[in-house]
C-alpha cells in the first residue's frame, strides 16, 4: 500500500466507499481493526498486560476497543471495560460488540476513580471523527488516564487529538503507541501529534481509496 497521509474527511469517505461500494461489512472492518490493536499490544515491549483497562466510547471507536477487550480476554489477559457514555445511544456495530463481550463474560467496571493498579490502558473513546473540544466528564477521564502510571495504547487516534492538524481539542490522551487504520492521518505527523501519539503503527484492515 502506498504511504499517504489523509484527513478525517478522507478517512470517512474511504470507509464509506469500502462499506457501501465495495461491500465489506462495517462489522468486518471493526474486527480487523481490533485484531490489529490486539496483536500490537501482545507483541510490543511498551505494554505490560498484567492488568488492562479498555476505556470505550459509544461510537465505532469504542466498538473497536470493546472488541480488543474481548480478544485479550479470550487470550487470558486480565482485562476490564469501562464504557464511557449512555449505552442506549451506542452505535449499531458497537452495540453488537458490546453484546458479544457480555456473552463471553468480559468484565465491566462502573467507575475508574482509581487507575493506579492498571498496567495498560486502551484509549478507544474518540477516533478521527472528533469535531469538538473534549470537555466535562470525558475531559476528566482523559486527565485520569494521563495521570495514571499505565502505558496507553490509542485506537486510531488519541482521544482529543485533531486528525487533520494534530491540534489538541481541549485536552488529549498522551499515548505510548497508536494503531491507526489503513492510512496515516495528517494530525499524527504534526509535532504535537507525534508527541501525543507515540509510536504509530498503520494497520492494513482493508480500507481503500475510491
From Swiss-Prot:
Per the UniProt entry, what species is this protein from, by scientific name? Oenococcus oeni (strain ATCC BAA-331 / PSU-1)
- For this entry, the protein name equals NAD(P)H-hydrate epimerase
Query: Which GO molecular function annotations are given, in alphabetical order?
Result: metal ion binding; NAD(P)HX epimerase activity; nucleotide binding
Q: How is the cofactor bound?
A: Binds 1 potassium ion per subunit.
User: Could you tell me the keywords of this UniProt record?
Assistant: Isomerase, Metal-binding, NAD, NADP, Nucleotide-binding, Potassium
- Could you tell me which InterPro entries the record lists for this protein? YjeF_N_dom, YjeF_N_dom_sf, YJEFN_prot_NAXE-like
Q: What is its EC number?
A: 5.1.99.6
One Pfam family it belongs to: YjeF_N
Q: Which reaction does it catalyse?
A: (6R)-NADHX = (6S)-NADHX; (6R)-NADPHX = (6S)-NADPHX
Summarize where K(+) binds, as residue positions.
61, 123, 159
Amino acid at each position: 500500500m502506498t504511504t499517504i497521509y489523509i484527513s478525517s474527511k478522507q478517512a470517512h469517505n474511504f470507509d464509506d466507499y469500502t462499506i457501501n461500494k465495495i461491500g465489506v461489512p462495517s462489522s468486518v472492518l471493526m474486527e480487523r481493526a481490533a485484531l490489529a490493536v490486539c496483536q500490537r499490544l501482545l507483541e510490543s515491549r511498551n505494554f505490560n498486560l498484567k492488568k488492562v483497562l479498555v476505556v470505550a466510547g459509544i461510537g465505532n471507536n469504542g466498538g473497536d476497543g470493546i472488541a480488543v477487550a474481548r480478544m485479550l480476554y479470550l487470550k487470558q489477559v486480565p482485562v476490564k471495560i469501562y464504557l464511557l457514555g449512555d449505552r442506549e445511544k451506542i452505535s449499531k456495530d458497537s452495540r453488537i460488540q458490546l453484546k458479544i463481550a457480555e456473552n463471553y463474560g468480559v468484565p465491566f467496571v462502573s467507575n475508574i476513580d482509581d487507575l493506579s493498579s492498571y498496567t495498560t490502558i486502551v484509549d478507544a473513546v474518540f477516533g478521527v471523527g472528533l469535531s469538538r473540544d473534549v470537555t466535562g466528564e470525558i475531559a476528566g477521564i482523559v486527565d485520569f488516564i494521563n495521570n495514571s502510571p499505565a502505558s496507553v495504547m490509542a485506537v486510531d487516534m488519541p482521544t482529543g487529538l485533531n486528525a487533520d492538524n494534530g491540534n489538541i481539542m481541549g485536552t488529549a490522551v498522551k499515548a505510548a503507541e497508536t494503531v491507526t487504520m489503513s492510512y496515516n492521518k495528517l494530525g499524527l505527523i504534526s509535532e504535537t501529534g507525534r508527541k501525543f501519539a507515540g509510536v504509530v503503527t498503520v494497520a492494513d484492515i482493508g480500507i481503500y481509496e475510491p
